[in-house]
């Protein structure tokens, strides 16, 4: 069917582009300034690779407050939310620099 052919084409393009997903868990607290700097680089730079999407939740420096974030190229949002058990980050892109991303999000 046309839908299957289109999906096969999309999957082929993604594989050729080397799109990867990196998932991290962390308990390290993060300041809003630190998170903003990371998201600025993810959204506008290439220090971490060619990032297409990032989202996650991290504990802030304030007890009981967490930052939730979403990022696409040239745009990101940070908001506060309810605490969770552990911080989680998901980054999708090509040529991802895993070690640099782990370092940025406190997973050395």
Regions found by a protein language model. Give the residues of each.
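C-terminal accessory "lid"/substrate-recognition subdomains
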Residues: 1-83, 94-108
């Amino acid at each position: 069917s046309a839908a299957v052919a289109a999906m096969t084409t999309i999957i082929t393009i993604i594989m050729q582009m080397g799109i990867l997903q990196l998932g991290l868990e962390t308990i390290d607290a993060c300041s809003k300034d630190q998170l903003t700097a990371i998201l600025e680089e993810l959204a506008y730079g290439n220090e971490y690779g060619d990032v297409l999407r990032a989202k996650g939740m991290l504990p802030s420096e304030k007890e009981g407050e967490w930052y939730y974030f979403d990022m696409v190229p040239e745009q990101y949002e940070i908001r506060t939310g309810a605490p969770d058990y552990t911080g989680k980050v998901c980054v999708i892109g090509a040529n991802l620099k895993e070690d640099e991303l782990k370092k940025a999000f406190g997973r050395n």
